[in-house]
Swiss-Prot record:
Keywords: Cytoplasm, RNA-binding. It is found in: Cytoplasm. One of its GO terms (cellular component) is cytosol. It comes from the Bacteria. PROSITE patterns: SSRP. This is SsrA-binding protein. Belongs to the SmpB family. It comes from Staphylococcus epidermidis (strain ATCC 35984 / DSM 28319 / BCRC 17069 / CCUG 31568 / BM 3577 / RP62A).
Length: 156
């Protein structure tokens, strides 16, 4: 049975499929505006970054489709699990990312959600989608590397 990969101590959620589906060209750290029940739910590990993306609207950046499960003890104060959340960045950073996304084929995707000094942060990646043959090529290269590593390990 394969070992389950352990997350680094501050990591709350990770978009592992993103590196398979996209070529990540640049990364940037952003804060995220959350409600009380959202941060409590995230600290419990109930966040999912799959299929989420960021976009610039009216000079502000928003994170869409990030699922945060409702907090069990939140009763009527609970949040909408798929609500659009505002990302906290400097104006120059937002403009730079906006310019990159206007180029055809680029998008901004969240790679990781983590805590830093008690604050929830999102690692965003400026990415270009991979074609199906690119994904196959990457899997072949990974398999070849694994075989080489096994052969070298068996030798010693």
């Amino acid at each position: 049975m394969a070992k389950k990969k352990s997350k680094s101590p501050g990591t709350l959620a990770e978009n592992r499929k993103a590196r398979h589906d996209y070529n990540i060209e640049d990364t940037i750290e952003a804060g995220i505006a959350l409600r009380g029940t959202e941060i409590k739910s995230i600290r419990r590990g109930s966040a999912n970054l799959k299929d989420s993306f960021a976009q610039v609207r009216r000079g502000e950046m928003y994170l869409n489709n990030m699922h945060i499960a409702p907090y069990e003890e939140g009763n009527r104060f609970n949040h909408d699990p798929l609500r659009t959340r505002k990302l906290l960045l400097h104006k120059k950073e937002i403009q730079k990312l906006g310019e990159r996304t206007r180029e055809i084929g680029y998008s901004i995707i969240p790679l990781k959600l983590y805590l830093k000094h008690g604050q929830c942060k999102v690692l965003l990646g400026v990415a270009r989608g991979k074609k199906k043959y690119d994904k196959r090529q990457a899997l072949k290269e990974k398999a070849v590397k694994r075989d080489i590593d096994r052969a070298v390990k068996a030798r010693y």
